[in-house]
Regions:
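Transmembrane beta-strands of outer-membrane beta-barrel proteins
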Residues: 441-443, 458, 481-483, 517-523, ...
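Transmembrane beta-strands of outer-membrane beta-barrel pores
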Residues: 447-453, 464-466, 486-493, 505-507, ...
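Active-site nucleophile-His-acid catalytic modules used for acyl/amide transfer and hydrolysis
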Residues: 236-311, 572-574, 644-646
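Membrane-embedded beta-strands of outer-membrane beta-barrel proteins
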Residues: 458, 501-503, 543-549, 587-589, ...
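Outer-membrane beta-barrel "beta-signal"
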Residues: 460, 648-660
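Repeated loop/turn-to-beta-strand initiation elements of outer-membrane beta-barrel proteins
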Residues: 466-473, 480, 508-516, 552-562, ...
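N-terminal accessory segments that precede or flank the first globular/catalytic domain
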Residues: 42-220, 370-507, 551, 593
Length: 660
C-alpha cells in the first residue's frame, strides 16, 4: 500500500472527494430511520387505539360484522364459522372461526401502503364494505390512516349507475336439477331506466361453477357441496334470453324498496365477493340463500337467513323478502316466449292455428288464398304467430327450415302489407305470484281403512309440490318431492309401521299440441310396501321411471282437463323377494280436472307385469279429490283398489293437509 493511499485502497485524493458524498448518504439514511421509527410507532399506536375501541364497543359481536364475513352459528358446538371458502377472504389465521381476530387483522390491513393497479388492490378497496362500516363505528382519522382512492370500484359503480334493486324469480324449470325449484338473482336498476329499458340493466347471479350436463351427477355433487359457487355479473337481457327464450320460464320481478345508502352498501359487498367462492349446496347454501345474505348486508336490521338452516327453496326466500315490512315496492310479470305463443293460440280457432303453424315451417306461402280469405286482423295475427313461433324454434337451437332468416324476413314483409292491428289483449299475470302460493313443506293428518283394517296416518314432506296441490304460484303438471314419508298405525296385529319413504319423486306432465310436443316423464326412488306370496308386506327398495304423452282436452267445467298416458318400468330389490329382485313394466293412464277453482279431481289406472325375479302382475286404480280450504290448508279424499300376488284390497283415506 502506498503511503498516500487510504486504508480502503483508494487514492487519497479520491477519498477526500468521495467523503462528503458518503457523509451525505449516511445523513439521509439516519434521517430516514429517524422518521420511520416514529411513523411506525405512530401507526402501531393508532392501530392499538382502534383495536382497543373495537373491543370496548364489541364490534366483532355485531350482526353487521358477522353478515359482512358470512359467519353462521355452529350446529352443535358453540361458536361460529365462516361460509366463504376462498383462502384470502379471511385475513387472520383463525379468521374463519374467530370474528374478533378477523376484525383486528382487517384493521391492521388498512394501514397497508399498497398502491392500486389493475391486478392489485389496497385492502381499503379490496374490503371496501368492511372499511366503510368500521369507519362508521370507529371514525378513522385520515391524518393517522391515509385514505386510499378506490378508482376501480368507483368506475364500476358509475357504470352501473344504480338507482334501485329488484329481486328476480324465474319460475321452476323441471328439466334442469339446478333450477327445478326456480331460481333467484338480483338486478341493479339504473337511473332513467323504465320497464322497456330494464333489459339493459345488470344482473347479479350466484351459481355453481360447473359445465356438468349430466343432471344426476350435478344433483349428487350439489347435495354434498361438490362445486364451488361464486357471484357473477352480466347484462340482464342475457339472463332473460336464457330463461324466457331458451327454457320457457316466466319471470317475476320484485322491485325492492332499498335506500341509496343500502344500495351502495350492497354493491360494496358484491365488490368484495368478486374473487370469493363458497361451497355450493343444492338445498341450503344455494343461489337464493346467498342473495338473502346480500340483502341482510344492505339492510342489517332484517333477518332473512335464520329460517333457512336446512334448506332454502327459492320461492320461500322470495316470500321471506316480501314479508319484510316496507321491503317490496312493486312487481312485474315477464311471460316467456312459450307463454306468449300459447296466449296467441288461445285467441285463434283451429284452422287459424294450423295455418300459422304451416306458415312458420314454410309449408304454406304468406300469399296463400286461405290466409287472404281471412279478415285483415286475423291475417295479421296468423302472420305474427308464425313469425314468433319461427323465432322461438330458432332460439331453442332447432332449424325448422333451410333458411329461417329468409323466411322470417318474408313473414315480416307480408305482415307490413296488412294495414290492420291485431288488438290482442296482453298476457294477464297469474292471479297468484310465486310468493303467494302454498308453503313448500307439508304435513298431512289422515284416517282411513285398508283391507279391512282401520288406520291413522302421519305423512310429511319437506319440499315441494305434488300434482294434487293447488297450482297457484307453481307450474301445473310438475311434481317435485324430496323425502316424502308416511307412518301408519293400524288396528289389530299390524300395529305401527313405516308405510313408505321416497327420497326423490319427480313428475313432469307437459301437454302437447301442434306447436309444442314435449315428452312427459316420471322418476322416483325409495321404499314402499309390496305384498309377496306369503301375504306379508315388506318395505322394498325400488327405482321407478316412466315416459309418456299428455294432452289438454275440452271439458264441461271450463277448466283445463289433463289426460296422460305412460309406459312405466320398475326395479325392486329385497332379500324377501324371489331371487332377491323384481323387474316389471306396464302402462298407466290418468286424467286430472279442476271442477272449481278449489276442487280438483284425478283418476288413474296402472298395471305392471313383473317378468324377472319375483314375477307377478299388479294393478292399481283410484280416484283422488282435493278441496282447498285456504292457501295453506286442504282436504283430501283418496279411494283406491290394488291387486298384488292374486290378492285384492280397497283403501279409503281422508286427510287434512297443512302447508308451511
Amino acid at each position: 500500500m502506498l503511503g498516500n493511499d487510504t486504508p480502503s485502497g483508494e487514492p487519497l485524493g479520491v477519498f477526500l472527494v468521495n467523503r462528503p458524498i458518503r457523509l451525505v448518504r449516511w445523513f439521509w439514511l439516519l434521517s430516514l430511520l429517524a422518521l420511520i421509527g416514529p411513523a411506525h410507532a405512530a401507526t402501531n399506536d393508532y392501530l392499538a387505539e382502534l383495536t382497543a375501541k373495537s373491543r370496548t364497543l364489541g364490534l366483532h359481536e355485531r350482526r353487521e360484522w358477522n353478515r359482512l364475513l358470512h359467519y353462521t352459528k355452529n350446529l352443535l358446538l358453540p361458536g361460529v364459522h365462516g361460509l366463504a371458502d376462498a383462502p384470502r377472504f379471511y385475513l387472520a389465521v383463525d379468521g374463519k372461526t374467530n370474528p374478533q381476530t378477523e376484525l383486528e387483522a382487517t384493521l391492521a390491513s388498512f394501514f397497508s401502503g399498497v398502491e392500486e393497479t389493475n391486478q392489485v388492490q389496497n385492502p381499503q378497496c379490496q374490503f371496501i364494505a368492511r372499511f366503510a362500516w368500521l369507519d362508521e363505528q370507529l371514525g378513522f382519522d385520515p391524518a393517522r390512516m391515509p385514505r386510499r382512492a378506490c378508482k376501480r370500484f368507483e368506475e364500476w359503480r358509475d357504470t352501473l349507475n344504480p338507482q334501485g334493486v329488484s329481486l328476480i324469480f324465474p319460475s321452476a324449470y323441471i328439466n334442469n336439477p339446478s333450477s327445478m325449484y326456480g331460481h333467484t338473482l338480483l338486478r341493479i336498476d339504473g337511473k332513467d331506466q323504465d320497464e322497456k329499458t330494464r333489459l339493459l340493466a345488470y344482473a347479479i347471479n350466484y351459481a355453481a361453477n360447473t359445465n356438468e350436463t349430466n343432471g344426476v351427477v350435478f344433483a349428487i355433487k350439489g347435495l354434498f357441496g361438490g362445486y364451488a359457487g361464486a357471484f357473477s355479473m352480466m347484462p340482464y337481457y342475457l339472463k332473460v334470453r336464457e330463461y324466457n327464450d331458451l327454457e320457457n320460464r316466466d319471470i317475476w320481478e320484485y322491485e325492492l324498496n332499498l335506500t341509496a345508502p343500502e344500495i351502495d352498501r350492497l354493491l360494496m359487498h358484491v365488490w368484495e365477493l368478486g374473487p370469493v367462492w363458497f361451497d355450493y349446496y343444492f338445498f341450503d347454501e344455494n343461489c337464493s340463500y346467498y342473495l338473502l345474505e346480500l340483502l341482510e348486508v344492505a339492510r342489517p336490521g332484517i333477518d332473512l337467513t335464520s329460517r333457512f338452516r336446512w334448506w332454502a327453496i327459492p320461492a320461500d326466500t322470495v316470500r321471506a323478502v316480501v314479508e319484510q315490512q316496507g321491503m317490496l315496492k312493486r312487481t312485474h310479470y315477464r311471460p316467456s316466449n312459450a307463454t306468449l305463443i300459447q296466449h296467441r293460440l288461445g285467441l285463434m280457432n283451429d284452422s287459424e292455428r294450423s295455418l300459422a303453424f304451416r306458415i312458420s315451417l314454410g309449408r304454406v306461402e304468406p300469399e296463400d288464398p286461405r290466409l287472404s280469405a281471412l279478415p285483415a286482423p286475423q291475417q295479421a295475427r296468423v302472420l305474427e304467430l308464425g313469425y314468433d313461433y319461427l323465432n322461438y324454434v330458432r332460439a331453442t337451437g332447432r332449424k325448422p327450415v333451410a333458411e329461417p332468416a329468409a323466411l322470417a324476413r318474408e313473414l315480416l314483409l307480408a305482415r307490413s302489407r296488412i294495414d290492420a292491428a291485431t288488438d290482442d289483449p296482453p298476457v294477464a299475470a297469474p292471479e297468484v305470484r310465486p310468493d303467494q302460493g302454498h308453503g313448500t313443506s307439508r304435513l298431512a293428518f289422515a284416517a282411513g281403512r285398508r283391507d279391512g283394517a282401520n288406520f291413522v296416518e302421519l305423512r310429511g314432506r319437506p319440499t315441494y309440490h305434488d300434482l294434487m296441490d293447488a297450482d297457484g304460484g307453481y307450474a301445473r303438471g310438475a311434481q317435485i318431492e324430496f323425502f316424502d314419508f308416511g307412518v301408519r298405525h293400524y288396528d289389530g296385529d299390524i300395529g305401527s309401521r313405516m308405510e313408505d319413504v321416497t327420497p326423490v319423486r319427480i313428475i313432469s306432465i307437459a301437454p302437447r299440441n301442434e306447436f309444442f310436443q314435449p315428452l312427459s316423464w316420471k322418476f322416483d326412488t325409495g321404499w314402499a310396501r309390496r305384498r309377496i306370496a306369503d301375504g306379508s308386506e315388506p318395505l322394498v327398495f325400488g327405482v321407478h321411471g316412466a315416459t309418456g304423452l299428455a294432452w289438454v282436452v275440452p271439458d264441461p267445467f271450463r277448466s283445463t282437463t289433463l289426460v296422460y298416458a305412460f309406459i312405466e318400468s320398475t326395479a325392486q330389490v329385497d332379500q324377501r323377494l324371489d331371487s332377491g329382485f323384481a323387474l316389471g313394466a306396464g302402462p298407466s293412464l290418468g286424467v286430472q280436472c279442476d271442477l272449481t277453482s278449489r276442487w280438483r279431481t284425478a283418476a288413474y289406472l296402472t298395471g305392471q307385469r313383473f317378468f324377472a325375479g319375483d314375477t307377478d302382475t299388479t294393478w292399481s286404480g283410484g280416484l283422488r279429490q282435493r278441496y282447498t280450504l285456504d292457501t295453506n290448508h286442504a282436504l283430501r279424499l283418496d279411494l283406491s283398489h290394488d291387486r298384488q300376488e292374486k290378492q285384492s284390497w280397497n283403501t279409503a283415506l281422508i286427510a287434512l293437509d297443512w302447508y308451511f
